[in-house]
From Swiss-Prot:
This is Uncharacterized HTH-type transcriptional regulator YjiR. One of its GO terms (molecular function) is transaminase activity. Residues 1-69 form the HTH gntR-type domain. The lineage of its organism: Bacteria, Pseudomonadati, Pseudomonadota, Gammaproteobacteria, Enterobacterales. The keyword Ribonucleoprotein does not apply. The modification N6-(pyridoxal phosphate)lysine is found at K313. Pfam families: Aminotran_1_2, GntR. It comes from Escherichia coli (strain K12). GO terms for biological process: alpha-amino acid metabolic process; biosynthetic process. InterPro entries: Aminotransferase_I/II_large (IPR004839), HTH_trans_reg/aminotransferase (IPR051446), PyrdxlP-dep_Trfase (IPR015424), PyrdxlP-dep_Trfase_major (IPR015421), PyrdxlP-dep_Trfase_small (IPR015422), Tscrpt_reg_HTH_GntR (IPR000524), WH-like_DNA-bd_sf (IPR036388), WH_DNA-bd_sf (IPR036390). CDD domains: AAT_like, WHTH_GntR. Keywords: Aminotransferase, DNA-binding, Pyridoxal phosphate, Transcription, Transcription regulation, Transferase. The gene is yjiR. It comes from the Bacteria. In the C-terminal section; belongs to the class-I pyridoxal-phosphate-dependent aminotransferase family.
Amino acid sequence: MTRYQHLATLLAERIEQGLYRHGEKLPSVRSLSQEHGVSISTVQQAYQTLETMKLITPQPRSGYFVAQRKAQPPVPPMTRPVQRPVEITQWDQVLDMLEAHSDSSIVPLSKSTPDVEAPSLKPLWRELSRVVQHNLQTVLGYDLLAGQRVLREQIARLMLDSGSVVTADDIIITSGCHNSMSLALMAVCKPGDIVAVESPCYYGSMQMLRGMGVKVIEIPTDPETGISVEALELALEQWPIKGIILVPNCNNPLGFIMPDARKRAVLSLAQRHDIVIFEDDVYGELATEYPRPRTIHSWDIDGRVLLCSSFSKSIAPGLRVGWVAPGRYHDKLMHMKYAISSFNVPSTQMAAATFVLEGHYHRHIRRMRQIYQRNLALYTCWIREYFPCEICITRPKGGFLLWIELPEQVDMVCVARQLCRMKIQVAAGSIFSASGKYRNCLRINCALPLSETYREALKQIGEAVYRAME
């Protein structure tokens, strides 16, 4: 991000937060230049960016003023999915979206990929090169089945931040959170079982269940506080549910952080009904609040919570470094790993361990939390400007994803196909439901570095939505 873009996003965030009100005069170009230690031309470029976004308006010989803006869209209401076990569909839509990822000319607003070009990742790339040059025998040999111990020790220390007390021996390294969740599900479930999920739910988890022949029951979920404990309890009383998949921290796709009281209530239900919790914490490190939120796993006393995570969202998906703390299922999951995915790549594990050990990881996370928070604020500004006023939009407490609910008559599955022909890709809401609900919703990735390309893409999405409403 250039200096003027950084300044523009900072000012946009202040406008979004109400620190600069409608009609209020903004600081002069000279005073902002002195305050932030940047050139006059940098401030002028930042103001021109905000003017293009229609956040500010210039007045001759008077300066810049905050523009009249649309009202803040409301947060989507509690979801109301079909509350009975169903077989998972939507694979064709997911496959179409995944295949489009290979087209580098497409604006990729559908992928939940972090910013992998952040300068704070440079120490990791240097360490990867060093590891390969100086540890050739280890790098080219077989890995330990549980993964490199030095990495497991660092992950155990990281997990202390979320309240989970584990040792290196409690952790199994995988090739990503998707692999962690897949192994966890296979260690517990069999074809014909029923698993409860939040609604909407990350499509990758549901497609894993589909491949295993497991049915899903979607549970109503509040976009600000998470899964309905009451609805979950009712489902547990009605159906032989084997387990529940939860993303309680910086949820994908809704962005909420489940309050601690609700996390403990869900764990209490799991204990009472003797079910397993599959906890996905892959976005937990990106929470806006500090210290980061606790995991459900941190309150687990009998090993029924299988905690899955990775560096895919906090660092980069290409590392293929994930982990699982499987509790009472440790031995079974080790066998599943040996039988199915076997060993991991030692080089990326060793580099990641050093990246954490030397403090680079925490510096990187602090920086990315700020950047993603500003990106979310700025993308929200753009969406408010270009989309119909009838929308609802989430207010994430971390991560980098936005969930937008459009008027009922908008079929985002059809709109997404049109946008793909225009070289813009979004994730239609229906792939986040086992039964194909949320066709009038979409998920947007806000991790991508701010640029005119993404602003223009959001403008074209808004125009396509308006056409769908006609």
